[in-house]
């Protein structure tokens, strides 16, 4: 997967917009958000995407993001926080409650490093965002070599990140997939981050300028003579 759209169930998205996203050339979708999450909204958004054969990932930040019919679940582990609630606390409580029913083969964990101090997710998780490139690289190595996480996700959450930092991270990961998300608002920015990240995630621009969002997926289309 090279490109994913991230959709927030707390935000309104017309059916025709969803159809355009499905046929844009993207490789799939993440459904996830930070606040005002309700199970009905998650179900409605999942149903809107039902016409696609593309993978749909539910990013589980609380119980409202759990749909039994979903095929793919992402479990975020926030690495740059000292609040254990977001590294393993909530995870343990959900496992304690639902452990006998969890479809483990449909679950993928992702090591998050959140880098925009003004983002809701940074404030919620108490993320330490004032990091050097060396700090970020250390977290990448921690994710791959200590925790053996399949995904390392650098999240600037609404703010376009530093391509040089992203490049440096890409050079130290070999087995763990490198995902980048944050502030991609043009196909040029998408192409820049795609040079380094295995997968780019495009989110906010969907709700600001749908056509520009669609353009970010076109850079991966194979050219025909």
Swiss-Prot record:
Involved pathway(s): Membrane lipid metabolism; glycerophospholipid metabolism
One Gene Ontology MF term: magnesium ion binding
CDD domains tied to this protein: PcrB_like
Cofactors that this protein relies on: Mg(2+)
Taxonomic superkingdom: Bacteria
Keywords of this entry: Lipid biosynthesis, Lipid metabolism, Magnesium, Metal-binding, Phospholipid biosynthesis, Phospholipid metabolism, Transferase
A biological-process GO annotation: glycerophospholipid biosynthetic process
Protein family per UniProt: Belongs to the GGGP/HepGP synthase family. Group I subfamily.
Function: Prenyltransferase that catalyzes in vivo the transfer of the heptaprenyl moiety of heptaprenyl pyrophosphate (HepPP; 35 carbon atoms) to the C3 hydroxyl of sn-glycerol-1-phosphate (G1P), producing heptaprenylglyceryl phosphate (HepGP). This reaction is an ether-bond-formation step in the biosynthesis of archaea-type G1P-based membrane lipids found in Bacillales.
Summary of subunit composition and partner proteins: Homodimer.
Protein name: Heptaprenylglyceryl phosphate synthase
UniProt source species: Listeria innocua serovar 6a (strain ATCC BAA-680 / CLIP 11262)
Upper classification of the organism: Bacteria, Bacillati, Bacillota, Bacilli, Bacillales
């Amino acid at each position: 997967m090279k490109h994913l759209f991230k959709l927030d169930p707390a935000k309104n998205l017309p059916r025709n917009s969803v159809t355009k996203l499905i046929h844009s050339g993207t490789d799939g979708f993440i459904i996830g958000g930070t606040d005002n999450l309700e199970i009905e909204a998650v179900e409605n958004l999942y149903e809107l995407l039902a016409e696609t054969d593309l993978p749909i990932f539910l990013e589980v930040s609380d119980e409202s993001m759990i749909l039994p019919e979903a095929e793919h679940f992402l479990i975020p582990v926030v690495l740059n926080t000292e609040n254990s609630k977001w590294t393993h606390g909530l995870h343990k409580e959900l496992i304690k409650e639902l452990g006998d029913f969890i479809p483990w083969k449909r679950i993928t964990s992702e090591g998050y490093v959140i880098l925009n101090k003004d983002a809701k997710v940074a404030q919620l998780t108490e993320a330490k965002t004032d990091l050097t490139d060396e700090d970020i690289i250390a977290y990448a190595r921690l994710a791959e070599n200590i925790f053996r996480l399949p995904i390392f996700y650098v999240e600037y959450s609404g703010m376009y990140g530093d391509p040089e930092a992203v490049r440096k991270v890409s050079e130290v990961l070999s087995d763990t997939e490198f995902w980048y998300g944050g502030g991609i608002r043009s196909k040029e920015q998408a192409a820049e981050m795609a040079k380094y990240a295995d997968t780019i995630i495009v989110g906010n621009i969907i709700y600001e300028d749908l056509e520009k969002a669609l353009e970010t997926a076109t850079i991966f289309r194979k050219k025909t003579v």
